[in-house]
């Protein structure tokens, strides 16, 4: 088994990268992919860059070059579910774009033309993540993660997203693009992110302060998931 792991930023991949054994690096088109073994599992760790285009391009390179059996998207997110605090975990049941709008042609908010309204995470991977959450005794929410090319900071964009997607649990900038590419490649995926900020008018200050906390929490989750997969054989 080979597991693809995707993080957007250096802070989101550095702890995992440093623990990869027999590490090799592929750099292409602004992306870096690190291959080797982590916790007994063959891994391909992608640092994609920030935003939907970078995430889609990087995920495509990862799937084409490394052919992982599954993909886990890690990193940070802004929490919208009322129970989420900094350091808590959000697990995707599905991902959607919050900045796509072709509703004039009968599509749902966030639905890209010719695509499903949502890209649905793999149930077995969701169960794996939630099992690890219980083992680690972390606070977590399973729910909708919405992505767009904007850092959500302030009342107006927050209200717009909540109005269009009432069940949204978290927002960030890559997950829907990753889910979209995995859907096209028929590759199972799940998004497991730690909360770096609670989306409000001071989100940017919280993000800068707590990104390292979120990175440590999401790394803890990835390592637990890999260990469980290795134990299952």
Swiss-Prot record:
Pathway: Amino-acid biosynthesis; L-methionine biosynthesis via salvage pathway; S-methyl-5-thio-alpha-D-ribose 1-phosphate from S-methyl-5'-thioadenosine (hydrolase route): step 1/2
Coiled-coil features, chain-numbered ranges: none
Catalysed reactions, as listed in the record: S-adenosyl-L-homocysteine + H2O = S-(5-deoxy-D-ribos-5-yl)-L-homocysteine + adenine; S-methyl-5'-thioadenosine + H2O = 5-(methylsulfanyl)-D-ribose + adenine; 5'-deoxyadenosine + H2O = 5-deoxy-D-ribose + adenine
A Pfam entry, by short name: PNP_UDP_1
Binding locations of substrate: 78, 152, 173-174
Role, per record: Catalyzes the irreversible cleavage of the glycosidic bond in both 5'-methylthioadenosine (MTA) and S-adenosylhomocysteine (SAH/AdoHcy) to adenine and the corresponding thioribose, 5'-methylthioribose and S-ribosylhomocysteine, respectively. Also cleaves 5'-deoxyadenosine, a toxic by-product of radical S-adenosylmethionine (SAM) enzymes, into 5-deoxyribose and adenine. Thus, is required for in vivo function of the radical SAM enzymes biotin synthase and lipoic acid synthase, that are inhibited by 5'-deoxyadenosine accumulation.
Protein name per the record: 5'-methylthioadenosine/S-adenosylhomocysteine nucleosidase
Organism: Yersinia pseudotuberculosis serotype O:1b (strain IP 31758)
Gene assigned in the entry: mtnN
């Amino acid at each position: 088994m080979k597991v693809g792991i995707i993080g957007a930023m250096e802070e989101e991949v550095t702890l995992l990268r440093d623990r990869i054994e027999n590490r090799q690096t592929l750099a292409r088109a602004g992306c870096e992919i690190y291959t080797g073994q982590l916790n007994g599992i063959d891994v391909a760790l992608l640092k994609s860059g920030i935003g939907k285009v970078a995430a889609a391009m990087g995920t495509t390179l990862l799937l084409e070059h490394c052919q992982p059996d599954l993909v886990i998207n890690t990193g940070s997110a802004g929490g919208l579910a009322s129970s989420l605090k900094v350091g808590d975990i959000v697990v995707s049941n599905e991902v959607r774009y919050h900045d796509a709008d072709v509703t004039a042609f009968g599509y749902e908010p966030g639905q890209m033309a010719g695509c499903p309204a949502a890209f649905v995470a793999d149930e077995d991977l969701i169960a794996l993540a939630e099992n690890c959450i219980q083992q680690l005794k972390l606070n977590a929410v399973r729910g909708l993660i919405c992505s767009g090319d904007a850092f959500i900071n302030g009342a107006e964009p927050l209200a717009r997203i909540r109005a269009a997607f009432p069940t949204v649990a978290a927002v960030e900038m890559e997950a829907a693009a990753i889910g979209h590419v995995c859907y096209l490649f028929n590759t199972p995926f799940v998004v497991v992110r730690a909360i770096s900020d609670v989306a409000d008018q001071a989100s940017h200050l919280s993000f800068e302060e707590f990104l390292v906390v979120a990175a440590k929490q999401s790394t803890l989750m990835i390592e637990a998931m890999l260990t469980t997969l290795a134990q299952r054989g």
